[in-house]
């Protein structure tokens, strides 16, 4: 048996208010249409649902049975409609993002602040991952998308879009101030202690290749887990390190560290968005992605 859900919806409100006129008012309809719909419902179900009187209606046993089943469904559907409406207008919702430390520090945090100011009802879940881990999280469907720093290896089915280029600088503690006036070579850096991220990181791979291309070998004396840790170690005079210029800027301006200069040009890196274009995003995630890619181009 097929019965139009609209009839059940009208039945729910008539039974709830025990009055055709009140139900019509709530539904934005008129009493004759409501009465006609309920007559059709009774005809299709082949039973009497209401006892009509001048004061309104009361439910028959069959009506009571139907209402006991319909009420919870009607409330859940109404809640779902309200939630979808709130989601569509960005009053509520959630976004899950995997981000690398560099991407979060020099790009994503500012975008998140602007988005959260405009849409405070959207919940944000940010996961801190390395670039390979972030890409894998997108592939596994664990996050809506990832914001990473290059280099990155992207598998088939995923798309990568450049959001912002950035460059890195070589910095050292104040004991290396005398070197700041020189133009060093990568080979000469072998004479000084170096601080780097772990051997498994894409940043380490990036600099390993950079050194090799100039007939030099990258041999760090100290490994750190994060760029923030590297900066702390640099300030503690443990060695030299390559760090994103935006992350070193404040410390350089305060004179806590010094910038050293290389003869070789450090290749530019990029902050990129990675997403699965086969997987649809919810309204909030789609809106934030549009904000990020307003002036993008492929990496």
Map each language-model feature to its residues.
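Alpha-helical linker/hinge and terminal dimerization helices associated
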Residues: 44-45, 66-88
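A late-sequence structural motif
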Residues: 107, 258-299
